[in-house]
């Protein structure tokens, strides 16, 4: 069973689950409003898949995706990300809720930032091991087919830092 400290870092990384989404118009050009709507809907879809225990949510990551979380090495590449979440989901039940504060489209890159809450429970005992609120930034890269994939993601705690005494 993973140590709670490691679980904290892995839980923080969980915010990255955005599925690929396409928003090309009939003329083949991109529409920033449609891209933003697709990214927001994608996050809602990923939330549902995670809460149902569907490991397929990881298909949202680009092959060269990187998860950057505090106090843990970067998780680099699709295979490493899939391995990470497969291991977690074998023993943990997760309940996540995303809140998007902003989506900005800039050509073939876009970013989304917001917060998420995550509760992780041991599947065998149902004991809650993590119950956190975090902030996140996702950077998406438009794929050749027009879909968006999570390319980079960074998370940190939404709790105020402890004040020195």
PLM segments and residue spans:
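Short beta-strand edge/turn micro-motifs at domain boundaries
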Residues: 22, 133-161
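A short hydrophobic beta-strand element
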Residues: 108-118
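A solvent-exposed, acidic/Ser-Thr-rich amphipathic alpha-helical stretch
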Residues: 33, 37-38, 42, 54-106, ...
